[in-house]
Each structure stands twice: as C-alpha cells, then as structure tokens.
A protein has these predicted regions:
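Expand to "…catalyze enediolate/carbanion chemistry for C-C bond making/breaking, isomerization
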Residues: 1-228
C-alpha cells in the first residue's frame, strides 16, 4: 500500500519457503502492486513452477551466462502451447483465481514477465546471443555480482568506486545496446535514489530502490539522527 509499482520476493538470497512466498504474493496483490519472484537459477524448475502457481506476475532468473541457460529458464516459465515451454499444467491453483484452467493457462504465456539477471562477465560476453532468445522480456542488471565477476572488486577499485568504473560503464553500454536492438526492457537494483534519474535517462525503467532491510535501516537511522 506504499505506492510501489512492483515488489520482488527473493527466493535466491532470502530465507523463503512456499507458504511464506504465498502469503507475500497475496499481500502484494491485495496492495495493488505487481509481483516478481527471484528463483535460485535457470535450472530451478520447481521454484519457478511454485512461484507461478502461487500467483507471481513475473520471474527473475539469476546468474545467466549463456543463451542455452537463458532458453532453459524461459522454457520453465511457459506452458507448452505451440511448444513454447515446459511448464506443467495443474488445476486448481491460486494463480487461476476465477479464470479456470483454460481462462488462465490459455493466456498466461502472454502475461507472465520473464526477466534474466545480468551479473557475470560471461553474460556480457554472450549478450547478443542471450538477447536473441525468444521471450526474454526484461534484462536486469546486478552490479554487485557483475563487478565481482569482472574482477573490479578484487583490489582494483574501492567500494563504491567500482560502480562508476570505465569497465562497468562499458559492460552496461553493451547491455543497453543489445537490449534496445531487441526491444527488451531494462531493469536494475539500486540502493537509494541517488542515481535513479541517471539510469532512467539511459533507458532503465524497471528499477529497484532497496530491499526490506535497507528500508528499515535507512528509516531507523533517520529517526535516530532526528532525535539527537
């Protein structure tokens, strides 16, 4: 109810199990926002299935390195209509609501948002091939892991200088170019709003500005400073 367009439920780093995820997805829908679930990886078929069956509007697949991995992850998100994917059909399930099996499954392939996380040097290297995979809807830049993968945080740059390094700028530019050529949306993680305008101007329109712990800590520190 705070006005965010979308919220991410993190099953990669967060201590999450299906019952908790289900409750969070219900709360997000009730608040009027859209939901995206980050799963463990492209081969987390069960995690992708559970998230979509429980009503996730989108799936974020981390640690993509190759077009083959991208295609495998996409396949798990889509029902096999027209051989589009390999998602299992089950009835009834929460995500169907009142639509019924055909009402939900028949249109879900067009409605689910499939996002791949760009966070490795190999992903940047293979970006053209990854962007050519059908039904990659969104490419989500993960700067932390990408900097580590590129060797930028191993004594080369101090934190947070790695975020403005020429190497990361070049990788980001390649991501933007390849995604734009294929009409793929761009997203990214940010902690705070200092650089949001900069990345909006670069074409990123799907931006996270923090997680729950970040929000709690930021507001807690602000209250403390206001009282001393």
């Amino acid at each position: 109810h705070s006005g965010y367009d979308w919220l991410l439920v993190d099953c990669q780093h967060g201590p999450m199990e299906p019952v908790t995820m289900s409750a969070m997805l219900c709360a997000i829908q009730n608040g009027g926002a859209k939901s995206m679930v980050r799963v463990a990886g492209y081969d987390d078929r069960n995690g992708i299935q559970q998230a979509l069956d429980l009503g996730a509007d989108g799936i974020l697949i981390p640690y993509i390195n190759t077009a083959e991995e991208a295609a495998a992850g996409v396949s798990c998100c889509l029902y096999p209509f027209g051989k589009a994917g390999t998602r299992s059909v089950y009835f009834p399930q929460r995500s169907m609501n009142k639509q019924g099996l055909l009402g939900y499954a028949g249109g879900n392939n067009d409605n689910v948002l499939i996002a791949l996380q760009v966070e490795t040097a190999d992903c940047i290297k293979n970006m053209e091939a990854i962007c050519a995979v059908p039904r990659v809807d969104l490419l989500f830049l993960g700067q932390n892991d990408l900097c580590v993968s590129m060797g930028l945080f191993d004594g080369k740059y101090d934190f947070p200088a790695m975020y403005t390094s020429p190497e990361l700028e070049a990788a980001t530019a390649k991501l933007i170019k390849c995604a734009t050529e294929k009409d793929i949306l761009l997203g990214m993680f940010q902690f705070g709003t200092d650089r949001v305008t900069e990345f909006l101007d670069k074409g990123f329109n799907f931006i996270s500005v923090g997680n729950d712990l970040h929000h709690v800590l930021t507001q807690s520190f602000a209250h403390k400073e206001a009282l001393v």
